[in-house]
């Protein structure tokens, strides 16, 4: 849920402060693809679905945020997560006008965006995820 936090850097600094010696933090979240056009598309879809959305960060942004917070990333894994559209919007109780806006936005996406996110006719798509483990820098 880090993509809902207003100050991820501050949150990671607080994690570092309270982390026991030898302790680790594990973070998993939906991730920005890092490419500007794909990033804008994902952030827009996420914000339409859930008004509490702040930002999905790319792997490079996560590494920078962790390093600036005084953490050392031990391991970083990325993956792809298929999202079934109907259950995805239902989980957040997205209003019908916003569901329609998302569908229209999906339909207007470029061929490159549609291919990258594996957009389906029913609105389902695939998003990137990140999982990383970090410890305090010495």
Give, region by region, the residue ranges found by the protein language model.
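Histidine- and/or cysteine-centered catalytic micro-motif in compact active-site loops
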Residues: 1, 30-31, 79
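A short SAM/SAH-binding and catalytic strip from SAM-dependent methyltransferases
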Residues: 1-8
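A short, basic/aromatic alpha-helical/loop segment that forms part
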Residues: 5, 56, 125-127
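A short glycine-rich, Lys/Arg-flanked "PGG" loop and its adjoining helix->strand segment in the class I
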Residues: 9-24
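Short, glycine/charged-enriched secondary-structure capping and boundary segments
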Residues: 10-13, 40-43, 90
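Conserved class I S-adenosyl-L-methionine
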Residues: 24-48
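Acceptor-substrate binding/catalytic loop of class I
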Residues: 46-61
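Conserved Class I S-adenosyl-L-methionine
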Residues: 60-63, 67-138
């Amino acid at each position: 849920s880090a993509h809902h936090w207003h100050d991820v850097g501050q949150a990671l600094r607080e994690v570092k402060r309270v982390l026991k010696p030898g302790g680790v933090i594990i973070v998993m979240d939906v991730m920005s693809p890092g490419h500007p056009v794909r990033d804008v598309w994902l952030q827009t879809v996420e914000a339409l679905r859930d008004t509490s959305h702040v930002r999905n960060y790319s792997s490079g942004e996560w590494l920078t945020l962790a390093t600036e917070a005084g953490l050392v990333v031990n391991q970083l894994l990325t993956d792809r997560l298929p999202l079934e559209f109907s259950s995805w919007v239902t989980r957040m109780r997205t209003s019908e006008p916003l569901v329609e806006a998302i569908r229209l936005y999906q339909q207007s996406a470029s061929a490159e965006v549609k291919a990258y996110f594996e957009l389906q006719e029913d609105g389902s798509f695939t998003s990137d995820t990140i999982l990383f483990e970090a410890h305090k820098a010495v």
